[in-house]
């Protein structure tokens, strides 16, 4: 029983660390986006600069920057959402996620899934397992 409590605590700490890591990534990304918007929004010329000419910029770099920021923001937001959901429902693996989802939707639980393979696939799987086990033994 004590081992189960330790394992549960370890599992919850890992879930918490994943959530807080994703949240920190999201907050840092949003801060960088805010700073990038402020820099691009206001162009105040210095004392001897012309005020009717825009500073030179590369459209390609602007597009790459926007794509990078948007991708990082969406990845951070969705990872925070997913890790928070999994932390709240105590889900650590994909198998547990499938189990909880089926339970939530009142679908019957399939204990044994159909994992039958044809001959070629089973041979290839066995060869890969042998290769990986021989690499681990070195």
Curated annotation (Swiss-Prot):
Gene designation per UniProt: AIM11
Subcellular compartments: Membrane
Protein name: Altered inheritance of mitochondria protein 11
Membrane topology according to the record: Multi-pass membrane protein
PANTHER family linked to this entry: ALTERED INHERITANCE OF MITOCHONDRIA PROTEIN 11
Family listed: Belongs to the AIM11 family.
One GO cellular component term noted in the UniProt record for this chain: membrane
Lipid biosynthesis among keywords: no
Keyword Aminoacyl-tRNA synthetase applies: no
């Amino acid at each position: 029983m004590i081992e189960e409590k330790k394992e549960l605590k370890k599992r919850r700490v890992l879930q918490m660390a994943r959530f807080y890591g994703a949240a920190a990534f999201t907050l840092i990304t949003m801060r960088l986006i805010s700073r990038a918007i402020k820099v691009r929004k206001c162009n105040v010329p210095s004392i001897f600069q012309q005020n009717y000419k825009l500073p030179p910029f590369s459209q390609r770099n602007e597009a790459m920057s926007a794509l990078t920021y948007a991708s990082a923001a969406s990845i951070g937001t969705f990872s925070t959402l997913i890790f928070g959901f999994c932390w709240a429902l105590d889900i650590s693996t994909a198998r547990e996620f499938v189990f909880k989802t089926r339970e939530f939707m009142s679908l019957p639980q399939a204990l044994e899934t159909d994992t039958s393979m044809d001959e070629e696939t089973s041979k290839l799987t066995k060869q890969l397992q042998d290769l990986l086990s021989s690499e681990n033994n070195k």
